[in-house]
């Protein structure tokens, strides 16, 4: 008898702790929404640079799989238009697919 009361009481405590009220969730979401900021990283513009040219944004590079990537030359960071991601043909194909997806979400005109 005492064991069944302990089991029921424990179950009720777990249920109360595990399922917070809807009101507290709404308050937490409201606070989160107040702190959120929208950051626009890409600006819509037509492409003007070919593979190998220096760039600042993906939209500047012409080509469906061409992105503005970072390479290091003599210890300095250089951004340039590129589409090759690897010397391995399989990895390069996957990289071009990722570049295509990245360009799709860049919203370039």
Swiss-Prot record:
Putative ion channel inhibitor. Its main location: secreted. It is found in: Secreted. One of its GO terms (molecular function) is ion channel regulator activity. Residues 19-46 form a propeptide. GO terms for cellular component: extracellular region. Keywords: Disulfide bond, Ion channel impairing toxin, Knottin, Secreted, Signal, Toxin. The keyword Secreted applies. The presence of a 'disulfide through disulfide knot' structurally defines this protein as a knottin. It comes from Cyriopagopus hainanus. Disulfide bonds join 47-62, 55-68, 59-108, 61-81. Belongs to the neurotoxin 25 family. F7 subfamily. This is Hainantoxin-XVIII-5. Expressed by the venom gland.
